[in-house]
């Protein structure tokens, strides 16, 4: 028995208002292990000050990014339902730079090429819209390792950044 998983047939299309609840729900399930990893790295005291209710904050961040007129939002659809999404900011940080703002894949569909397809779609979208550079940011903790692997495979160059935290009280 092979451990390889067959890539999933998906369509990527602009996100519609009716997709938003499903996208928020899948994003929360997708990021649960990521936030758990961040909590393990930072410890409870710092994590809970930064993210007292990460689910509510993250749900609002996804809704806001998807509704933002300054962003382009797309959804990956398989079997008639959203299985992933991405929001893209054009001229982010610098003129001519496009950014993958938020990207997420339903855990039931991870490791089937959805994140890679959304990333490549995003890069192509930025190129078509006249961007010269694409950027994406992610964490350096173990929970973000799958995302880093996707961006490495997509040809992004890593710029290591260090962010330190210290509890003051």
Where in this protein do the model-derived segments appear?
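Short, flexible, glycine-rich and Lys/Arg-enriched loop motifs at helix boundaries
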Residues: 39-47, 136-148
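Flexible, active-site-proximal loop/turn residues at the rims of small-molecule/cofactor binding pockets
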Residues: 92, 109, 140
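Short phosphate-binding/catalytic loops that engage adenosine nucleotides
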Residues: 114, 131, 156
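Acetyl-CoA-dependent GNAT
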Residues: 10, 14-101, 106, 119-120, ...
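Conserved acetyl-CoA-binding loop-helix of GNAT-fold acetyltransferases
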Residues: 105, 111-124, 149, 153
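Accessory recognition modules or surfaces
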Residues: 112, 135, 143-154, 169
């Amino acid at each position: 028995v092979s451990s390889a998983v067959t890539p999933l047939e998906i369509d990527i299309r602009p996100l519609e208002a009716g997709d938003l609840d499903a996208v928020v729900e899948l994003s929360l399930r997708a990021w649960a292990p990521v936030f758990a990893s961040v909590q393990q790295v930072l410890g409870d005291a710092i994590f809970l000050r930064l993210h007292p209710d990460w689910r509510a904050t993250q749900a609002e961040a996804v809704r806001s990014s998807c509704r933002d007129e300054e962003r382009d939002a797309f959804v990956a659809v398989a079997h008639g339902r959203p299985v992933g999404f991405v929001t893209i900011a054009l001229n982010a940080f610098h003129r001519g730079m496009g950014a993958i703002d938020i990207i997420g894949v339903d855990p039931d569909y991870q490791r089937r090429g959805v994140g890679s397809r959304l990333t490549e779609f995003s890069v192509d979208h930025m190129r078509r819209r006249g961007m010269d550079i694409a950027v994406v940011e992610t964490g350096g903790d173990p929970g973000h390792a799958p995302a880093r692997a996707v961006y490495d495979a997509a040809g992004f160059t890593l710029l290591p950044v260090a962010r330190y935290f210290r509890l003051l009280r």
